[in-house]
């Protein structure tokens, strides 16, 4: 949906997943490049401008911040304080306004009725980075999901956007 939102703003985008292990429950890494000019490279992103951590239990098993720029953005799916997550020391190295935690799973349950945090995280990403307009995020969600599912996901994204802006 992030790449769809970027396309809707007239940008070029590329999104693709990377699966490490073939077993259920293994961490999945997804990449999205956004640029105002054509994107020709197709390899994984080794030095991201931003990371979105959907599952904070990965902090102690995977280096989710590897390669992140010194002025990069971090969005975490959690309602818990950074100290409780055990990552506050690393996050202190980044600009304070570039770091945010949003309880995206809880927002998804509230608005969609299921623990599907992707749309909420996209709303939070738009707020934290300013890379995408919320209107594009909303349109991408509604393009991907019809009816009540689209409405619920758009509402979760708006709630996350507003929570991230207020943080």
What are these model-derived regions, one by one?
Residues 1-167:
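Active-site cofactor/cluster-binding pocket
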């Amino acid at each position: 949906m992030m790449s769809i939102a970027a396309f809707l703003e007239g940008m070029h985008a590329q999104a693709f997943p990377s699966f490490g292990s073939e077993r259920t429950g293994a961490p999945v890494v997804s990449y999205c490049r956004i640029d105002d000019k054509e994107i020709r490279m197709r390899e994984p992103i080794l030095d991201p401008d931003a990371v979105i951590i959907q599952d904070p239990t990965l902090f102690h098993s995977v280096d989710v911040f590897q390669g992140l720029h010194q002025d990069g953005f971090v969005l975490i799916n959690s309602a818990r304080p950074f100290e409780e997550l055990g990552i506050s020391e690393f996050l202190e190295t980044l600009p304070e306004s570039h770091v945010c935690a949003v309880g995206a799973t809880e927002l998804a349950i509230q608005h969609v009725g299921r623990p599907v945090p992707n749309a909420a995280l996209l709303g939070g990403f738009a707020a934290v980075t300013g890379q995408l307009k919320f209107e594009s995020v909303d349109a991408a969600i509604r393009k991907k999901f019809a009816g009540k599912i689209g409405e619920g996901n758009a509402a979760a994204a708006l709630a996350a956007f507003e929570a991230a802006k207020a943080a």
